[in-house]
C-alpha cells in the first residue's frame, strides 16, 4: 500500500513540476533559458509565435542522416 502511494506521489510531483515549467516557459518565451529542465528543451527547436516547436523525428530521416 505504501509503495503505491509513493508511486502516485512521485507522478504527481513530476506532473506538477512539468506544469510549472510549462507556465514558466510560456512566460519567458523563446528560446528557453538554461534553468528550465532539459526535457522541455530540444536540440533542434523552432520558435513560432514565441512558442517552442520541436520537430517530430521520423525513423526514415534519422536513418538517412546516419547513412
Swiss-Prot record:
Subunit structure, as described in the record: Homodimer; disulfide-linked.
Entry's Gene Ontology molecular function annotations: toxin activity
Species this chain originates from: Myrmecia gulosa
Keyword Transcription regulation set for record: no
GO cellular component: extracellular region
Subcellular location: Secreted
Keyword Signal listed: yes
Record note on modification: Contains 2 intrachain disulfide bonds (one per chain) and 1 interchain disulfide bond.
Coiled coil: none
Tissue expression pattern: Expressed by the venom gland.
Full protein name: U-myrmeciitoxin(01)-Mg4a
UniProt record similarity statement: Belongs to the ant myrmeciitoxin-01 family.
Superkingdom assignment: Eukaryota
Keywords noted in UniProt: Disulfide bond, Secreted, Signal, Toxin
Signal peptide (from-to): 1-25
Amino acid at each position: 500500500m505504501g509503495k503505491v502511494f509513493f508511486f502516485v506521489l512521485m507522478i504527481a510531483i513530476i506532473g506538477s513540476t512539468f506544469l510549472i515549467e510549462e507556465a514558466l516557459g510560456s512566460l519567458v518565451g523563446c528560446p528557453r533559458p538554461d534553468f528550465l529542465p532539459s526535457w522541455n528543451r530540444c536540440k533542434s527547436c523552432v520558435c513560432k509565435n514565441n512558442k517552442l516547436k520541436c520537430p517530430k523525428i521520423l525513423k526514415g530521416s534519422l536513418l538517412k542522416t546516419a547513412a
